[in-house]
């Protein structure tokens, strides 16, 4: 696989009008530019779709989606190429997160896709790092990223301006537990090809394999 080959980053979302823009701003700061962002709105009852359309001057389009895996049908599709990162919004009938994930997989236009939660933000080199294993070995079918909770984190335009341990003891313990799990356990298990799970908050997958396995 060549470095120039693009990937799809997609986010299933439901009632996240207040937070999606932070994720988009962090995607704009990525040093890797060969990707598109796809948002699947799973029938939100708030203004999730409306805010995205207005914030990024999106236009309604017609685009056939071949549903190789089952999911609820789309209601409308919007797209913009005016921003640094191409953005597509698919609004669909509510079917739950798994159904929204299926729609995202069906709509991906590239061989690899990255799943990201709506409340995630990325470091500037995150996409470069998570795609490195598939660039070095085309047999790699899934890659997991390191996740840390954003407790007591200051964000500015989708960027972590200040990171510190929370003052709340329970929140602090959560940060320590995440670090222990991702920076110790998972890295250790990976040395023995023993990783059992890829986090849904930030994981990369090979599209044709996922469709074949019907996961």
Where are these regions (language model features)?
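Acidic donor-binding/catalytic loop of UDP-sugar-dependent glycosyltransferases
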Residues: 47, 120-133
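Long helical/loop segments within the catalytic core of UDP-sugar-dependent glycosyltransferases
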Residues: 65, 69-70, 77-84, 96-100, ...
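Short beta-strand/loop segment that forms part of the nucleotide-sugar
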Residues: 34-43, 65-69
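The conserved acidic donor/metal-binding loop of glycosyltransferases
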Residues: 42, 101, 117-121
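A conserved acidic beta->alpha catalytic loop
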Residues: 41-61
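N-proximal low-complexity "stem/linker" segments adjacent to membrane-targeting elements
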Residues: 1-29
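Short, acidic, metal-binding catalytic loop of nucleotide-sugar glycosyltransferases
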Residues: 25-34, 54-60
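Short aromatic/hydrophobic "clamp" motif used to bind/position activated sugar donors
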Residues: 113
């Amino acid at each position: 696989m060549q470095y120039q080959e693009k990937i799809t980053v997609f986010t299933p979302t439901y009632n996240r009008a207040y937070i999606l823009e932070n994720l988009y701003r962090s995607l704009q700061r990525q040093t890797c530019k060969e990707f598109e962002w796809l948002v699947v709105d799973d029938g939100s009852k708030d203004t999730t779709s409306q805010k995205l359309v207005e914030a990024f001057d999106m236009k309604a389009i017609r685009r056939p989606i071949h549903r190789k895996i089952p999911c609820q049908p789309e209601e409308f599709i919007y797209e913009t190429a005016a921003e640094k990162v191409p953005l597509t919004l698919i609004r669909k009938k509510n079917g739950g997160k798994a159904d929204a994930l299926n729609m995202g997989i069906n709509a991906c236009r590239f061989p690899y896709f990255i799943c990201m939660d709506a409340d995630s933000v990325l470091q500037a080199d995150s996409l470069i790092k998570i795609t490195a294993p598939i660039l070095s070995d085309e047999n790699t079918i899934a890659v997991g990223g390191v996740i840390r909770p954003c407790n007591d984190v200051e964000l500015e335009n989708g960027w972590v301006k200040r990171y510190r341990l929370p003052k709340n003891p329970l929140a602090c313990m959560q940060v320590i537990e995440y670090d222990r799990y991702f920076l110790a356990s998972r890295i250790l298990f990976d040395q023995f090809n023993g990783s059992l799970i890829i986090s849904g908050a930030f994981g990369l997958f090979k599209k044709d394999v996922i469709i074949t396995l019907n996961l």
